[in-house]
């Protein structure tokens, strides 16, 4: 058999894979992280809670009805109150319930060191629709709190899940009308004597549209920004991890050098405002984010 002869084979070999797409450029990574931070500071669980309460006003303790529409149970925990509902029914007002939910709220709950806190947690797995066509549906949990201490004001907001709403009484709110899919928590505090500020983000946002570079998702892990007036040794750079998913579905991870609660003493020589980026396991250059504009708020909270 000559060298030019070809021996048939029963195997089918896949075509060579194309070269992987290049990582997003640094400006696109930076703009996407900053856009996600802007969105995080617009996180609005209260808009969802308010519509929830329009459709299902919170009952007083003792007003529950385990045989009604919907099944409704109430709880009294002192400074906290709660209720649970479940049903597939239409009540006497024409409101239709399908699914289940839980809500709790607390006022002046006392914690260590004289801290007093107010807040709420609401969950929904299903749909509620009023007779006038106003509706809310979703699957997830929302929460919000603020806490008062002798010198510090703390706060936090979270949306974990997707909510949609419509009808004449539904608000025009991005967290109820867009394709965004949040699983994001934002916590922070203000130290009043020096107006020192701190923000920490955990979780992410997907289903993004119109973000720089076609980015479709951004996630954060212990992503912390703290001002110089809050005694940060590295106020010019965040700490923690940010990850950006490009239009191809591949992620770029950015590890920043600032402080986090787990690592409060960052290397001062690495504190240059830029994190180290990695794409498909290889270094992809620096990504720089200036936290100052996100920490410069008046009063106790950035919202």
Put a short name on every predicted segment.
Residues 1-303:
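Low-complexity, intrinsically disordered segments exposed to solvent
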